[in-house]
Amino acid sequence: LTHGVRWVSELAYHDFITKELPENEFFGDLVKEKLIYYPTVTREPFRNQGRLTDLIVSGKLCADIGLPQINPETDRALMCGSPGLLVDLCNILNGLGLKESPRMGDPGDYAIERAFVEK
C-alpha cells in the first residue's frame, strides 16, 4: 500500500494503518504478516521521500520494500489520485507490460478508482 502526499500532516491514515490495524482482533495478525505500507512525502523531510512515479521508475520503491520490480505476471494495482498522477501511473504501468482493466468485471492488471477523479 503506497500513499504519496506533499506534507507529513497529509498522511491521514498513517496511525490507523501502522497502529490500529495491526492490533485488530480479527485480522491484525494478517496485517502484521502481509501488509507493506509505504508512505512517501514530497515537500518536507520524511523517511521515504519523492513522487511515487519517480520511485517506481527508478526501482527505489520495490528496493525499499524488498520486493522484485513490478511484473505483469505477479502484480496487480488499484490506483486512486489526481488526474495527472493517474495518467502518469498508467503510462508507467503500461510501459512495464501491465494492462488496464477496461471496465468493471473485465480482468486486467490494474484498475483505476474513478469515484473521486475530477476532470
Residue ranges of each PLM-predicted region?
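Reductase modules of NAD(P)H-dependent flavoproteins
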Residues: 2, 9-119
